[in-house]
C-alpha cells in the first residue's frame, strides 16, 4: 500500500511541477520569438511600435509568447590596442551603443513585459528618454541605471552580441521564431508578423489561436 501511495504521489508531482528553468506549467504553450534590433534604427523603431506591440496587445498574445529582445543589431566588437580592452561599435554610432546598452540593462532588470512596454515608450523618439517614460509608467528603473553605470558598454552587450553575431544578420530588425533563423523570409515576417506568428504557433503546437482564424 505504501509503495502504491508513493508512486501516486510521485506521479502527481510530475503532473503539476513547473517546467525546469522557466517557471511555466506544461500546459502553458509559448512560442519563442526573438527580436534583434537597434535603438536608433528607424526600421527597428517602426516594427516594434507599429507591428510587434500591436500584435501582442490586440491579439492578447502575451500569454502565448516567450519574447526575447536583443538590442545589438549590426554592431560588433574590437580590441582597443591602446587600452587592451574590448570595445563595441554600432551601425548608428556611439550614441546607439550607449542606448543599446541601456535597453539591455532594462531587459536584465525588469520582467520582459514591463521592459518591452518601457522600451516601446522610449522608441517614440531618437532620444530614447528613459526618465519621462519610466515616470509616466510608474516603473522603478534604479537597477537599470545602476547596471548601466557599473559596467562597460561592451560588457553589457556581450551576451546580446554573442547571440546576434551567430546569425550573421544583414538587416535590422531580424525576427527569429523558435531559434530557426530564416534569412530569406525576413521582409515578409516584418510586414506580416501576425500571419507568421499564427503559422509558427500552429506548426509547433497544432493549435490555431482564436484571432488567427481571421489572419490565416
UniProtKB/Swiss-Prot annotation:
Belongs to the GILT family. Transmembrane segments: none annotated. GO terms for cellular component: extracellular region. GO terms for molecular function: oxidoreductase activity; oxidoreductase activity, acting on a sulfur group of donors; oxidoreductase activity, acting on a sulfur group of donors, disulfide as acceptor. Induction: Up-regulated following injection with the Gram-negative bacterium E.coli. Up-regulation increases between 1 and 12 hours after the injection, then decreases between 12 and 48 hours, and then increases again at 72 hours. This is GILT-like protein 3. Keywords: Glycoprotein, Secreted, Signal. It is found in: Secreted. Involved in the immune response to bacterial infection. Its main location: secreted. It comes from Drosophila melanogaster. Glycans are attached at residue 79. InterPro entries: Interferon-induced_GILT. Residues 1-23 form the signal peptide. It comes from the Eukaryota.
